[in-house]
Amino acid sequence: MIYLPDGVQDFLPEEYEFKRNIEDKFREVFKSFGYKEIMPPTFEYSENFSHLFDENSMYRFFDKKGNILALRPDVTAQIARIVSTKLEGRYPLKLCYVANVYRYEDTQVGKMREFTQAGVELIGTNHEESDAEVIALSIEALKSTGLKDFKIDIGHAEVFGSIVRNLNLGNEDVNLLRELLEQKNQSAIEDFIKQKEIKREEAKLLRELPLLFGGEEILEKLKKENFKETEGVLEYLDRVYKILEDFGMKEYISFDLGMVQNLNYYTGIIFRGFVKGLGYAICTGGRYDKLLKIYGKDLPATGFAISVERVMLALQRQSKGEWVKPRRVLVRYKEEERRRAYEKANVLRKEGNVVEMYTFKRCENIDLKSFDEVVDVGE
């Protein structure tokens, strides 16, 4: 038997057509918002990613000159490099992409190691309307596929960041706390508080964070706690929410103030998309105002990435995986009518049909039921 490595998959014709259809819908929506598509290389020097990703999470290899290369684990970092080193012009700059990403993930928890992301980056503006735009765009993109019952959970990196700065924790403890909050593991968080002897105000906030998810009332709930570090954050989230309300997006929005992102380059608003019946995020995004500075240009930015495969799975589970397929037409012809048959086939193709041509003799083994129409030329 010949097997594939863990975390990769083949896409057979119908499955791949379904996938491409979703990707094309995303491209159409991105383009309608003024975003231009870009395609970075599949691999780069490993050091281009080393400040963002652990070596063990990347697929790294040597070239013949001894350079250490890596398959891209993230497209946002690549776009930050491109904008910082190759793109000059007026801002804001709107870029989008559909590209495969490679990460050495734990496949036991349902993650792939090669997967496709469709995303956008809005660079050069730090206004709340920019954050609202990319969140609204993520919603419009997901809606374009026919997906139902999804929500965008919104949080802010500074809720967690302000706590960590006050606690003066080491990197290992910060990562542990991040993981506990991600899991909303209240008992383990309580043990962490006691073990680290965290002072009363921060301890109270840590206990609250796993519970701070829901509608706009969550913002009011945290405001009443009077944590100084979160005052500006809550005001900002409230302004973004009001913009999204004006956009007619209220039904798709909820808040999760205990949200933390695995990628450490987020500096402001963060968000994730979830769909009913699927335990994984189908979309992740947020503001990353310090990332471009690493590559030499100090510009604010915000964006998101949608997992195409997870959207496929969600659509299949919702039985929304069908799309309007083009009509399939069979053109049968006599050999002496080949020229006329080809001209007829091209007319049908220009009308949006998928057309196959066979002589009458070759049609003996063709499944005529697989075609929506059969056109005979010369019979």
Curated annotation (Swiss-Prot):
Organism: Caldanaerobacter subterraneus subsp. tengcongensis (strain DSM 15242 / JCM 11007 / NBRC 100824 / MB4) (Thermoanaerobacter tengcongensis)
Taxon lineage: Bacteria, Bacillati, Bacillota, Clostridia, Thermoanaerobacterales
Major place of residence: cytoplasm
Keyword Protein transport recorded: no
UniProt xrefs under PROSITE patterns: AA_TRNA_LIGASE_II
Subunit organization: Heteromultimer composed of HisG and HisZ subunits.
Keyword terms, alphabetized: Amino-acid biosynthesis, Cytoplasm, Histidine biosynthesis
Family from the record: Belongs to the class-II aminoacyl-tRNA synthetase family. HisZ subfamily.
Annotated Gene Ontology cellular component terms: cytoplasm
SUPFAM superfamilies: Class II aaRS and biotin synthetases (SSF55681)
Annotated protein name in UniProt: ATP phosphoribosyltransferase regulatory subunit
Biochemical pathway: Amino-acid biosynthesis; L-histidine biosynthesis; L-histidine from 5-phospho-alpha-D-ribose 1-diphosphate: step 1/9
Other known facts: This function is generally fulfilled by the C-terminal part of HisG, which is missing in some bacteria such as this one.
